[in-house]
Amino acid sequence: MLQAEMIVFVGVILWMCVFSQEPSSKVMADRYAVFWNRTNPRFQRGDYHIDVCINDYLDVYCPHYEDSVPEERTERYVLYMVNYDGYSTCDHTAKGFKRWECNRPHSPNGPLKFSEKFQLFTPFSLGFEFRPGREYYYISSMITETGRRSCLKLKVFVRPPNGCEKTIGVHDRVFVDDKVDNALEPRDDTSHEAEPSRSDVSTSGLRHQTSRPLLALLLLCISLYLLL
């Protein structure tokens, strides 16, 4: 009788361990890619905005060019985080501060990528903390070859918690890759890296799916050994 109860107990533990790894039961982070250049049609309309949740990521990709493109034809930007007035007038001097700098248009490792994590608290002195229900603004400006000032701006709204219930089963962009592929060292909680390849995402999902059967097999072997 004791052996039968042990088998039932081990079976319940095994079931809980396996199904607790199901993707549908996990709340994950989304990533939002923004290609920061004048040819992006979403910037041309002047109303580029995204809605995010706490712990989501914003990935800003800088302009990147082949070596054959001369320096004077490349785009370079300094991105600022500003208040609403700075966003409306595209002026970073009023309560704004520099966030990132796109200054390597010929980077050998591909386009520079700057990642912002929308988190409530940060352990870094140069990090930034975000609050649900508020808007945040990013801008950059440059003088074009025609002498006109080009202003690119982005509005980010952090949704309240009741609007952020999501699971991996209904969201596509959920793989968070903290690997730094480029040669820049982050000074805060901003990561600097080259554009990830599609293989990084697909292999990550494959490893996640294959780990569950292996875990089940391992637990089954342990339980059988204990019953002998």
Swiss-Prot record:
Widespread expression in the embryo. InterPro entries: Cupredoxin, Ephrin, Ephrin-A_Ecto, Ephrin_CS, Ephrin_RBD. Residues 29-162 form the Ephrin RBD domain. Residues 184-205 are annotated as: Disordered. It is found in: Cell membrane. Glycans are attached at residue 37. Residues 1-20 form the signal peptide. Disulfide bonds join 62-102, 90-151. Pfam families: Ephrin. Keywords: Cell membrane, Developmental protein, Differentiation, Disulfide bond, Glycoprotein, GPI-anchor, Lipoprotein, Membrane, Neurogenesis, Signal. It is a lipid-anchor; GPI-anchor. One of its GO terms (cellular component) is external side of plasma membrane. It comes from the Eukaryota. Coiled coil: none annotated. Residues 184-198 have a biased composition (Basic and acidic residues). GO terms for biological process: axon guidance; ephrin receptor signaling pathway; mesoderm migration involved in gastrulation; positive regulation of peptidyl-tyrosine phosphorylation; regulation of actin cytoskeleton organization; regulation of cell-cell adhesion; regulation of focal adhesion assembly; regulation of GTPase activity. A lipid is attached at residue 204 (GPI-anchor amidated serine). GO terms for molecular function: ephrin receptor binding. Cell surface GPI-bound ligand for Eph receptors, a family of receptor tyrosine kinases which are crucial for migration, repulsion and adhesion during neuronal, vascular and epithelial development. Binds promiscuously Eph receptors residing on adjacent cells, leading to contact-dependent bidirectional signaling into neighboring cells. Induces compartmentalized signaling within a caveolae-like membrane microdomain when bound to the extracellular domain of its cognate receptor. This signaling event requires the activity of the Fyn tyrosine kinase. Belongs to the ephrin family. PANTHER family: EPHRIN, EPHRIN-A5. This is Ephrin-A5b. It comes from Danio rerio.
